[in-house]
Amino acid sequence: MANFKVLVVEDSPTMRQLIVFALKRVRGIDITEAQDGVDGLKKLSADHYDLILTDINMPIMDGLKLVSLVRNDPSYKTVPIVIITTEGASEDRERALAIGANEYITKPIQTSRIIDTAKRLLGIAP
């Protein structure tokens, strides 16, 4: 089975652990963690990832700015990006999708939703 590299960008250690816990249940995924958008950009410049999961509300650089910058990088134009956030308003969702996010998941999250979304976006059979 191919190994997919997944970047999880989340400032809350508890939420980051929950997302990582869910992803570890999927075979063939290598996970890298970042604590904010700036840290995420550093990781993205050092390696290539097959999937990015990011929060919106983070210090230093928020997730929407991260998505916008990532989408302007030709090597990441088609890499799936999942927003995971407490922002549940439809205009927040529309804005995130408009700047390039592929999925928008609101907290509280179910680990099964993270797993199913990652598998689908990476093309891993259920």
Predicted regions and their residues:
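Acidic, metal-coordinating helix/loop segments flanking the phosphotransfer/catalytic sites
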Residues: E33-L51
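C-terminal output helix
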Residues: I109-A118
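Two-component/phosphorelay signaling modules centered on CheY-like receiver
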Residues: P13-T32
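Conserved acidic carboxylate
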Residues: E10
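Receiver (REC) domain active-site loop signature in two-component systems and cognate sites
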Residues: M58-M61
